[in-house]
Design a protein with these regions (language model features):
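Short helices/loops that flank or line small-molecule/ion binding pockets
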Residues: 91-97, 224-232
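Short secondary-structure boundary segments
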Residues: 47, 105-106, 128, 218, ...
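His/Asp/Glu-enriched short active-site or ligand-binding loop at hydrolase and phosphoryl-transfer sites
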Residues: 67, 196-221
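A short, structured surface patch at a secondary-structure boundary
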Residues: 42-96, 100-106
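Bacterial N-terminal signal peptides that target proteins for export
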Residues: 3-24
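Extracytoplasmic substrate-binding proteins
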Residues: 38-42, 111-190, 212-216, 271-307
């Protein structure tokens, strides 16, 4: 009798032990599940340069939306597209239930950003980067927000090497007897061609490549064909703002330009076929991945001319 009582008691204890173990495991699982959900990142990226960094940090899976200036590869076609990064809609963003909105320093309007903050959505602006130091700081900030600090180390190393390569190309070009003269033109449907002078994003790219921007005024100005012809540019850089979805090749763009402005065929750039396109993304957000790439392309063109 005593043996049977002890056996029943032991069975009861074991059953309770198994019950508490199962309860503990289920509780831990629920905690881990809740913790995982709380750490889930749903990102809205507003600004071409910011979105480039998100992709470079291998954080595309976190994106729920980007603004209209951002370029996305085809496999991310399902990511929602918002409006212009200066004119964002709070309702459009909140409908996507993001946890984080990151944009350039001109992201806005402030009324929209304030509504998002009141809804407990984290909003972060990254300063425009005119120099390498700020670009690297922006990468670190974004990497911490997206939990990609390991990716940031490699990205910063890669960009530093590319900028170092541009510095070396600048030195090579500085040894030429005459510094190449570059003209940047912005073409926009319904408006005349505008030339980019000092203080523009194009001016930064030209300087990075080690060349001279022959437009000596500040900002953008409209110039006639005769005015451009008098400058005698060695290379013409073109960027377009249009509703056309398919990008044109350098040759197609050059042909379209010379058809519209035939006098430019008499410039050194027109005679030698040195008219090349500049991706619109390279002109947004200051020094970034696209701007560095554009400077590399321009430097390569100029070095080939010198050979």
């Amino acid at each position: 009798m005593l043996f049977q009582a002890n056996r029943h008691a032991n069975q009861s204890v074991n059953q309770w032990r198994l019950f508490f173990q199962a309860l503990t495991l289920s509780t831990l699982a629920a905690l881990f599940s809740t913790n995982a959900l709380s750490q889930e990142i749903k990102l809205v990226s507003a600004g071409a340069g910011v979105t480039e960094l998100v992709l470079a940090l291998d954080a595309a899976d976190e994106l729920v939306a980007v603004d209209s200036t951002s370029y996305l590869p085809e496999h991310l076609a399902t990511v929602a597209k918002l409006g212009y990064h200066r004119m964002l809609s709070a309702e459009g963003i909140m409908a996507l239930s993001p946890t984080l909105v990151v944009g350039s320093e001109v992201m806005g309007p402030e009324t929209t950003l304030n509504v998002l903050k009141q809804a407990k959505i984290e909003v972060v602006k990254l300063p425009s980067s005119a120099y390498e130091k700020q670009l690297m700081t922006n990468i670190d900030t974004l990497a911490q927000l997206l939990k990609r600090t390991d990716k940031a180390i490699q990205l910063k190393q890669d960009l530093h090497q590319r900028l170092d390569g541009l510095n070396k190309q600048q030195q090579q070009l500085s040894q030429q007897q005459t510094q190449p003269k570059i003209l940047f033109m912005l073409l926009q449907e319904g408006r005349g061609a505008r030339v980019g002078g000092k203080g523009t994003a194009a001016d930064t790219i030209i300087a990075l490549a080690g060349a001279k921007n022959i437009a000596d005024f500040e900002g953008y100005k409209s110039l006639s064909q005769e005015g451009i012809l008098s400058l005698q540019p060695d290379v013409i850089l073109l960027s377009t703002r249009s509703e056309q979805s398919d990008p044109q090749t350098d040759e197609q763009t050059a042909q379209a330009l010379l058809k519209e402005m035939p006098l430019l065929a008499h410039t050194p750039a027109g005679k030698n076929g040195h008219i090349q396109t500049l991706a619109p993304q390279a002109l947004l957000g200051g020094l970034g991945i696209s701007a560095i790439g554009a400077a590399e392309d321009l430097a390569a063109t100029l070095l080939k001319q010198d050979q």
